[in-house]
Swiss-Prot record:
This is tRNA-splicing endonuclease. The active site is at 271, 282, 313. Endonuclease that removes tRNA introns. Cleaves pre-tRNA at the 5'- and 3'-splice sites to release the intron. The products are an intron and two tRNA half-molecules bearing 2',3' cyclic phosphate and 5'-OH termini. Recognizes a pseudosymmetric substrate in which 2 bulged loops of 3 bases are separated by a stem of 4 bp. The keyword tRNA processing applies. It catalyses: pretRNA = a 3'-half-tRNA molecule with a 5'-OH end + a 5'-half-tRNA molecule with a 2',3'-cyclic phosphate end + an intron with a 2',3'-cyclic phosphate and a 5'-hydroxyl terminus. The gene is endA.
Length: 336
């Protein structure tokens, strides 16, 4: 059978519906015929299930539509994994904006209206606006045409950690940290604030983020109060400090303990359920704090995810806008 290009779709005449849509979920019915998206037509040409499109075989068809190559690679891979795949065209799928394909659960087709994955195709050299993620799968195609799937979500970040007793401590601001000489033991043991300087009962050193939060909540007394600590933080980091402080405070308010994630290349590693430092488990998340409009390359996203996976943690981006609202986006590897 041969197709004909019309209004950006490939029309296949009589018997097209039965052969392509009814039996295998390709395209959308058009009477007894079927209308195929170009990527579907390319796949059928590659399989030999479609003879030509306006006389063109696969080579000529791809040459005529060069921007089709990368989506074709993803479509082919998903089809060969056993999925029915609908191109995300208006009128074909619901909520089509921002995606390229809807992947139906195995055993289902476009007539079922079910969704396993909403897929966006990204070239390795492209860019990803992080606040557009959260309900899509990124299908990243590298320069050797290998595929990496990254699943994104908007997680609920919360825990049960906190201080049960009202505590107070005095501190001294020294360069980029605060030192507490006689801090209550529970501040560290139960709240996991700071680090002991030299031994179990030694002075407690707090990061500027920890000190700013404790000063703002009335736990820590320091010359100049929270404002002095925050000013020192801005001197050291600029606006980045304010974003990180917003995320730090929010995590603490939600019962999550944030600690430095420096050795993992992140802003924080987090613990959701801290009862005591002596019984501390592994951290669950790596958190990078970025502006709300942050854009990263697929390579950078993949590196973050790979590192988090390698240390058995989940990668989360905390996107902070000018009003201190936070959008949480998690990204992880996916094998469809």
């Amino acid at each position: 059978m041969e197709g004909h290009l019309s209004d950006g779709l490939v029309e296949v005449g009589p018997n097209g519906r039965e052969r392509y849509y009814d039996s295998s979920g390709y395209g959308r019915p058009d009477g007894a015929g079927v209308r195929l998206a170009p990527v579907e037509a390319a796949y059928l040409l590659a399989r030999g299930d479609l003879d030509a499109v306006d006389g063109m075989g696969l080579e000529a068809f791809l040459a005529d539509t060069p921007d089709l190559v990368v989506p074709f690679l993803v479509y082919r891979d998903l089809r060969e994994r056993g999925f029915y795949v609908s191109p995300a065209l208006e009128g074909w799928v619901a909520d089509h904006a921002g995606i390229d394909f809807v992947v139906h659960p195995r055993g289902d087709g476009p007539w079922d209206g079910t969704v396993a994955y909403r897929v966006r195709v990204v070239d390795e050299r492209g860019s990803v606006r992080l606040d557009s993620l959260g309900d899509v799968v990124l299908a990243v195609v590298d320069e050797e045409s290998e595929l990496t799937y990254l699943e994104t979500d908007r997680p609920a970040v919360d825990g049960t950690s906190g201080l049960e007793a009202d505590l107070t401590a005095d501190g001294v601001l020294l360069e980029d940290r605060v030192l507490c000489w006689d801090a209550p033991p529970a501040l560290y043991e139960q709240g996991f604030y700071g680090q002991r300087m030299d031994r179990e009962d030694g002075p407690l050193q707090l990061s500027l983020l920890e000190a700013a939060h404790l000063a703002a909540t009335g736990v820590l007394s320091v010359a100049g109060g929270a404002a002095a600590v925050e000013a020192r933080g801005r001197d050291a980091e600029g606006e980045r400090f304010d974003r990180r402080l917003t995320v730090y405070r929010t995590l603490r308010e939600r019962g999550v303990v944030p600690k430095t994630g420096f050795k993992f290349g992140a802003d924080f590693r987090t613990y959701a359920d801290v009862d005591s430092v002596s019984e501390l488990g592994h951290s669950e998340l790596l958190v990078r704090v970025l502006p709300a409009d942050a854009t990263l390359s697929p390579r950078d996203v993949a590196l973050d995810v790979r590192l988090a996976h390698g240390v058995r943690k989940r990668m989360v981006f905390a996107l902070v806008d000018d009003g201190d609202e936070i959008r949480w986006v998690s990204v992880s590897r996916l094998t469809p």
